[in-house]
């Protein structure tokens, strides 16, 4: 396994962790909150974002304008059944979601959730490191690499791992700050 492959895999993990963070509700409206909402559209589970135009007209409102007005009921039902904790307001033209301010208790829960997601990202990075180091040791055992080359590669892999773990910590700190800001 090449160092560039290790870096690519770790970068994908960082991006995945960032996407997970984006689905955590803060006090501000963010259309990413609806990324995981699936709508039963004529018997098919369809992502909400492919059925409607989603905008954030202000900091506390998400507006959902369905391309097909006949799907408003299903969209409303899907939002109610989702775990985002918001109640849709349907005015016949569009669906609005008002984002209430977060309570202190809810902020603490969200910080814990962000920490859990960050830890999952770190575990994924450590698994990538383990696989890469196993690959290097196997190459050394098969005499494809010298002992020194193997040790140097393992040190490089560890440096990259530390770098990407620090990036996840930075993302977590930024998300915690975002959640805690009133």
From Swiss-Prot:
Pfam families: RRF. One of its GO terms (biological process) is translational termination. One of its GO terms (molecular function) is ribosomal large subunit binding. GO terms for cellular component: cytoplasm. SUPFAM superfamilies: Ribosome recycling factor, RRF. Keywords: Cytoplasm, Protein biosynthesis. Its main location: cytoplasm. It is found in: Cytoplasm. Responsible for the release of ribosomes from messenger RNA at the termination of protein biosynthesis. May increase the efficiency of translation by recycling ribosomes from one round of translation to another. NCBIfam families: frr. Belongs to the RRF family. HAMAP family: RRF. This is Ribosome-recycling factor. The gene is frr.
